Every structure is written in C-alpha cells, then in structure tokens.
C-alpha cells in the first residue's frame, strides 16, 4: 500500500500521544476523536493519502480536503487522525504500520487506539479496559484502566496491536462498554435476530435513529485526558449521553416486544 503523509511539521516532543479511532459499529472512537479535535481547538498539520483507494475528497466550508487529516494540540500534546471515511479493512494493517513508522520518526511517546465492546457483565459500566504489551500493564492499571483478563483480539483492533507491539512507541488498545452494542447483543441473545445481515440492518437503523454511542465516546475522551494528563471539558457530551442511553433502551424495548404490539409503537427519535 502506498501511503503518503503530507505534514507541515510536528515538534519532536516525547510527551506527544497519538490517538486514533478503530472503526467499529458504535462509532464511539470516531466521536471521541471528533470531540477532542473541536474541544482542544486542535490545529490541522497534515493529511494522509492512500494511493490504492478510489479518490475520496472531503469538503469543509468549500475547501477540498483529503479524507484522513492529522490534527495536533501543542498544549495538550495530542496528535490525532480525523477520518472522514473509514479506512478500508484490506489496507488497515499497512495504514497502521506506516502511521506508526511516522510516529516513531517523530518521537511520539504513546499510540492508543479507541474502540468499544458490549458490556462484559449484565449492564455496561464506566470502566475503560485496555490491552497492551506485558511491560506496560501495571502503568495502565495506575491510570485507572481495567485489563481485559482473557480474550482473542482479531479484526482491526488485532491489526493495531500486532503493529504496535515491540516498537519504541508505547501502544495500547482502549475499549469502553457501549450501550448500543450491549443492546444489540441483548437482541441477538433473545433469538429474535438470526442472521448477521439482520443484525447489521438493525444496527444501521438504530444508528440512524439515535446516532453514534456518545456515552462510550465520553468514557474514551476521559481516558485520553488521563493519559495525556490534561483537562477536557466534557459537559456537552455528558448532557447528550444521558439522553442517548434513554433512546437506545426505548428503541430496543420496542424491538423486543411481540410483533403485534411493536407495530403500534413509534420508535423514539430526537
């Protein structure tokens, strides 16, 4: 994969933390990155072009932009990638490896990938879980994160961990429990949804009605703030997160009801 990084300059500061979102259905990581860019008033310092992708241009206030843009806050020491379209799965591994090569060259201290999972228990909580290399486990515990006890990590999250382990950049996968993904899991466990296609249709419909999981995004923003040792005003996310939890529950309740009754229900929307 030919990947070009066009950048105006990144100070070689060992306090810099690279934050990326791992594309997953709840979009919590994507929302967290967007919120950090806006709230920290991050400066656009470059962009990434993937040569093998069909041309995709993002338009911002009339200006043509590449779909993967690099933002930086010198004060916070946070570098992040704003993704206007998801990185295609078939190029994700190369994308991450070359991004981490660039991070190493620029003396970035740490790289974290943000993602979300269904609740590990009956309901989701406020904990943020992590997977990192063995020598860093105690440090991430000290940040207040919970280690994932036992799991097999595959997909895009697995590609990130495979790429970051053993590098000079410290790396970790951070995951928050998602109300949306928990609700979908409840639905599949109920036996009312049988196929992967049906799950994706319901998931897309739910996201269309209630939006990405801002509750999980809030947990991820707070996690980044702890890692970077900065203050981030999350009041806008907090207000939206409480409304979001209510909307997800009401929509899932309607789907779980017997069909005759569910037909009379109007799904809750903003």
Where are these regions (language model features)?
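Short, ordered loop/turn segments at secondary-structure junctions
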Residues: 116-117
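Accessory terminal and edge-of-domain segments that mediate assembly/interaction
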Residues: 1-79, 85-94, 98, 104-106, ...
């Amino acid at each position: 994969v030919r990947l070009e990084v066009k950048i105006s300059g990144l100070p070689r500061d060992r306090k810099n933390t690279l934050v990326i979102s791992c594309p997953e259905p709840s979009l919590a990581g994507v929302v967290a990155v967007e919120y950090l860019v806006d709230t920290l008033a991050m400066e656009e310092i470059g962009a990434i072009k993937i040569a093998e992708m069909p041309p995709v241009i993002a338009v911002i206030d009339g200006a043509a932009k590449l779909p993967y843009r690099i933002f930086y806050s010198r004060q916070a020491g946070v570098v992040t990638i704003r993704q206007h379209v998801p990185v295609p799965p078939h190029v994700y591994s190369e994308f991450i490896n070359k991004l981490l090569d660039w991070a190493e060259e620029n003396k970035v201290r740490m790289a974290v990938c943000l993602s979300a999972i269904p609740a590990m228990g009956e309901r989701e909580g406020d904990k943020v879980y992590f997977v990192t290399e063995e020598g860093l486990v105690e440090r991430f515990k000290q940040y207040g994160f919970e280690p994932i006890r036992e799991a097999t990590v595959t997909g895009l999250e697995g590609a990130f961990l495979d790429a970051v382990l053993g590098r000079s950049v410290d790396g970790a996968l951070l995951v928050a429990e998602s109300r949306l993904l928990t609700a979908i899991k409840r639905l599949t466990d109920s036996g009312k949804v049988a196929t992967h296609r049906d799950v994706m249709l319901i998931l897309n419909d739910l996201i269309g009605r209630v939006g990405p999981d801002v509750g999980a995004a809030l947990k991820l923003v707070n996690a980044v703030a702890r890692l970077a040792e900065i203050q981030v005003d999350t009041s806008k996310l907090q207000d939206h997160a409480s409304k979001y939890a209510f909307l997800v529950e009401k929509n899932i309740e309607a789907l779980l009801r017997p069909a005759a009754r569910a037909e009379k229900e109007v799904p809750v929307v903003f």
